Amino acid sequence: MAEQVTSAKATAKTVRIPARKARLVIDLIRGKSVAEAFGILKFTPRSGAYLIEKVLKSAVANAENNFDLDVEDLYVSEAFVNEGPTLKRFRPRAKGSASPINKRTSHITVVVSVK
C-alpha cells in the first residue's frame, strides 16, 4: 500500500542574492500558513522577497499538481537558504592594483506540508 504524501518541495539554485540577505526574508515566513506567507512576502520591501515568493509559488504548485494536496491546508514547514557558488570579479584600482568583488549566490528551498 502506498504511503500518503503530505509535503511538497521547491528549490531555486544559484540565485543572485547573498544568502545573508535572503535569510532575513525567509525567517519571516517559516511556520506560517501559505496564504499568510504570500501576504507577508507581497508587502516585504526587501530584495529577496520576490525570489522567495516565486519559490513558494512553485512549492504550492508542486503540492497541488503532483500530490493532489489542498492548498488551503498547506503551511511552510521548512524554509532555508544555503550559500551557492561565489562569482569572483576584480575592480581595477589606483597604481595598477585591483580589489576583489565577490558576487554571492544562494540556494533557496521551501517545503510546504499539510497541517
Curated annotation (Swiss-Prot):
Oligomer and partners: Part of the 50S ribosomal subunit.
Similarity comment text for this entry: Belongs to the universal ribosomal protein uL22 family.
NCBIfam families reported in the protein's UniProt record: rplV_bact
Signal sequence, renumbered to the chain: none
GO MF annotations in UniProt: rRNA binding; structural constituent of ribosome
Protein role: This protein binds specifically to 23S rRNA; its binding is stimulated by other ribosomal proteins, e.g. L4, L17, and L20. It is important during the early stages of 50S assembly. It makes multiple contacts with different domains of the 23S rRNA in the assembled 50S subunit and ribosome.
Protein name as annotated: Large ribosomal subunit protein uL22
GO cellular component, one term: cytosolic large ribosomal subunit
Residue pairs linked by disulfide bridges in the UniProt entry: none
InterPro entries hit by this protein: Ribosomal_uL22, Ribosomal_uL22_bac/chlpt-type, Ribosomal_uL22_bac/org-type, Ribosomal_uL22_CS, Ribosomal_uL22_sf
Pfam families (alphabetical): Ribosomal_L22 (PF00237)
This protein's UniProt keywords: Ribonucleoprotein, Ribosomal protein, RNA-binding, rRNA-binding
UniProt keyword Protein transport, yes or no: no
